UniProtKB/Swiss-Prot annotation:
Tagged with keyword Ribosomal protein: yes
InterPro entries named among the record's database cross-references: Ribosomal_bL12 (IPR000206), Ribosomal_bL12_C (IPR013823), Ribosomal_bL12_C/ClpS-like (IPR014719), Ribosomal_bL12_oligo (IPR008932), Ribosomal_bL12_oligo_N_sf (IPR036235)
Taxonomic source organism: Geobacter sulfurreducens (strain ATCC 51573 / DSM 12127 / PCA)
Gene3D superfamilies according to UniProt: 3.30.1390.10, Single helix bin
GO CC annotations, alphabetized: cytosolic large ribosomal subunit
The protein's role, per its UniProt record: Forms part of the ribosomal stalk which helps the ribosome interact with GTP-bound translation factors. Is thus essential for accurate translation.
UniProt keyword annotation of Ribosomal protein present: yes
Name of the gene this protein is made from: rplL
Protein name as annotated: Large ribosomal subunit protein bL12
Length: 127
């Protein structure tokens, strides 16, 4: 059996879609009993409990597509680019609005996604 190198693993991960990466992270978290957010929790542990909860709530945002507007095709293209979904899945998401496009992302990533969606004609909300 050929030995797999770190470079092989990195190359494989580079070619994965966003959804595949999310599934991989979840499987690794389950297998090893860890959380990808652990470094944030360690830093927050030094602060008082109430402050830690408030900080944690404000670090993750959801981008909600409220409606596609008049340029539905443009919105589908942006949704595909942001999520890595296939054409049918992206169309179903846009048709089923209001639906979340991205969950648990940083404020910067949420604002960038909202900007792209609004520029394509969509009505978007960040929660």
């Amino acid at each position: 059996m050929a030995e797999i190198t770190k470079a092989d693993v990195i190359s494989f991960i580079e070619n994965m879609t966003v959804l595949e990466l999310a599934e991989l992270v979840k499987e690794l978290e389950d297998k090893f009993g860890v959380s990808a957010a652990a470094p944030v929790a360690v830093a927050a542990a030094a602060a008082p409990a109430a402050a830690a909860e408030a900080a944690e709530e404000k670090t993750e945002f959801d981008v909600i597509l409220k409606s596609a507007g008049a340029n539905k095709i443009g919105v589908i293209k942006v949704v595909r680019a942001l999520t890595g979904l296939g054409l049918k899945e992206a169309k179903d998401l846009v048709d089923g609005a209001p639906k979340p496009v991205k969950n648990g992302v940083s404020k910067e990533e949420a604002e960038e996604a909202k900007k792209q969606l609004v520029e394509s004609g969509a009505e978007v909300e960040i929660k």
